[in-house]
Curated annotation (Swiss-Prot):
HAMAP family: NaMN_adenylyltr. The gene is nadD. The lineage of its organism: Bacteria, Pseudomonadati, Bacteroidota, Flavobacteriia, Flavobacteriales. GO terms for biological process: NAD biosynthetic process. It comes from the Bacteria. This is Probable nicotinate-nucleotide adenylyltransferase.
Length: 193
């Protein structure tokens, strides 16, 4: 089974995340997309970052009607700080019959050379890349790489920061969130302070 890993803080998950994840699941050779919720770094203070399990719950709510999208808390169980290369190795050990790939935006691809052991990632895993606004061009060392697949996908520029700020300022952002996610956020009074 081919699994695409889509990492994020998902603070909160929004329709932009779902559009990209679902597009990758439906328009590539991936069988599933796992939405990997990245844990809070205890060394960094982040007033607006919800608890790891609250964010995971939001991802569960958002993906429950999408059979090819699965929430994942795999990084919660790994020593911190963690690196993507470690997560990939752990998953390959845990699920040896699965083929794991990364999903990332063009902006992240252009900084891939700064990632820990990025060469090992490229040697052992496919990378599916979606377009982003304000990304000039893809770095030449990656543009024709056999393990990198540029996927034509909708360009969705919605940010979780924008959503949090608008909730705090009592603006209506319901169209940007899956209905169950909005209901849970509103009921729990998240991001209002």
């Amino acid at each position: 089974m081919k699994i695409g890993l889509y990492f994020g803080t998902f603070n909160p998950i929004h329709i932009g995340h779902l559009i990209i994840a679902n597009h990758m699941a439906e328009n590539s050779d991936l069988d599933q997309v796992w939405m990997v919720v990245t844990p809070h770094n205890p060394l960094k203070k982040k007033d607006t970052l919800l608890d790891d399990y609250q964010r995971l719950h939001l991802v569960n709510l958002a993906t429950e009607d999408y059979p090819k999208l699965k929430p994942s808390d795999i990084e919660f169980k790994l020593p911190q700080p963690n690196y993507t290369v470690n997560t990939l190795a752990h998953l390959q050990d845990k699920f040896p019959s699965y083929e794991f790939s990364l999903i990332m935006g063009e902006d992240n691809l252009n900084s891939l050379h700064k990632w820990k052991n990025y060469e090992a990632i490229l040697q052992n895993h496919q990378i599916y890349v979606y377009p982003r606004l304000n990304t000039d061009t893809i770095d030449n060392q990656f543009i024709n790489h056999q393990k990198i697949h540029i996927i034509k996908a909708p360009i969705v520029e919605i940010s979780s920061t924008f959503i949090r700020e608008n909730i705090k300022n009592k603006k209506n952002i319901q169209p940007l969130l899956p209905p169950k996610v909005w209901k849970y956020i509103d009921h729990s009074n998240f991001y209002k302070k």
